[in-house]
Amino acid sequence: MKQFLDFLPLVVFFAFYKIYDIYAATAALIVATAIVLIYSWVRFRKVEKMALITFVLVVVFGGLTLFFHNDEFIKWKVTVIYALFAGALLVSQWVMKKPLIQRMLGKELSLPQPVWSKLNLAWAVFFILCGLANIYIAFWLPQNIWVNFKVFGLTALTLIFTLLSGVYIYRHLPQDDKS
């Protein structure tokens, strides 16, 4: 259910883009993200930090896109979110000395410290590369290609990287946790 809720604003954005244009899609994205946030609060009495940060960035960059009637702002949102995620992962590892991935999953999984560090660093690099790919595609290729990349490309890349992370984690689980 949570994954569906997280994906819903993206589907709404894509549908409105195909039916109308980038500005209608941006307005729909803002509304859909707000609805998902409100629903999460009403239904679960909890809103995750990442969802709240994403909402704020959607409102700021989406609002700027609509106010200035300039799609470059909404295109930057993707890279800014990925940069923030990568930054949080790197700061947690190098400054706070405990990888964010470990803080998030450490209660459910027992992994050696080097595995947590490598996994955390791998996700940081993944987010950096996705942010850079977004810059290239958003500003060097046609808008419709960027929309398809944002909706399908980044989603597929994230799913694949999540599966690869799962394989990496499984390989390093203690034998009794693998069953």
From Swiss-Prot:
Q: Which domain of life is it from?
A: Bacteria
Membrane topology listed for this record: Multi-pass membrane protein
Transmembrane parts of this sequence: 22-42, 50-70, 76-96, 121-141, 149-169
One Gene Ontology cellular component term attached to this UniProt record is: plasma membrane
Q: Where in the cell is it found?
A: Cell inner membrane
Sorted alphabetically, the keyword list is: Cell inner membrane, Cell membrane, Membrane, Transmembrane, Transmembrane helix
Q: What is its main location?
A: membrane
InterPro entries for this protein:
YciB
Record-linked Pfam families: IspA
Keyword Membrane listed: yes
PANTHER family from the entry? Answer: INNER MEMBRANE-SPANNING PROTEIN YCIB, INTRACELLULAR SEPTATION PROTEIN A-RELATED
Show the NCBIfam families listed in the entry.
ispZ, PRK00259.1-2, PRK00259.1-3, PRK00259.1-4
Query: Which family does the UniProt entry place this protein in?
Result: Belongs to the YciB family.
Per the entry, what this protein does is:
Plays a role in cell envelope biogenesis, maintenance of cell envelope integrity and membrane homeostasis.
Q: What name is this protein filed under?
A: Inner membrane-spanning protein YciB
Q: Which organism was this protein described from?
A: Escherichia fergusonii (strain ATCC 35469 / DSM 13698 / CCUG 18766 / IAM 14443 / JCM 21226 / LMG 7866 / NBRC 102419 / NCTC 12128 / CDC 0568-73)
